[in-house]
Every structure is written in structure tokens, then in C-alpha cells.
Amino acid sequence: MANSKSAKKRILVAERNRVRNQAVKTRVKTMAKKVLSTIEVKDVEAAKVALSVAYKEFDKAVSKGILKKNTASRKKARLAAKVNSLVSSL
């Protein structure tokens, strides 16, 4: 348990940031899952739209410092590869 006033404040700030970061991470994962679900039903146009929305969420998470740049780039590239393979298969 924190003893000093500043340490107590840091506990509150850390919890607030944890909740905020978790919300952003959840939103990013949800958008990625939407892309994958549109790929499974083979809906090319919906997959492209979902991919652009997912890109936006990944970029927001990077700008807020929640995800590292390379992590977001890797996940975006993998999603794009799956969408492109869907497009080329049809």
C-alpha cells in the first residue's frame, strides 16, 4: 500500500490509464475480428471497409502509445494479406 500522497495519486492515475488503454485495445481487437468475419463469409467490399476501419483504430492506438508501431504494422499487414488473398481468390 502506498504511503506518500504522490504514490497514492499515482495509483489512481495508473488505474485510470489502465482502464482507458484496455478500452482502446478491446476496440482494436474487435475491429480486427470484424475483418476476419467478413473474410469468412467472403464479402470483399465489406472486408475492404472493415479493413480501413481497423487501420484507423490501429493508428489511433499507436498515436496514443498503447500499441508499438511495429506491432500495429505487423497486425495491419497480416489482415491486409488475408483480404488480398480473398480478393485474388474470387
Swiss-Prot record:
One of its GO terms (cellular component) is cytosol. The keyword Metal-binding does not apply. GO terms for biological process: translation. Coiled coil: none annotated. It comes from the Bacteria. GO terms for molecular function: small ribosomal subunit rRNA binding; structural constituent of ribosome. SUPFAM superfamilies: Ribosomal protein S20. Keywords: Ribonucleoprotein, Ribosomal protein, RNA-binding, rRNA-binding. The keyword Transferase does not apply. Belongs to the bacterial ribosomal protein bS20 family. Binds directly to 16S ribosomal RNA. This is Small ribosomal subunit protein bS20. The gene is rpsT.
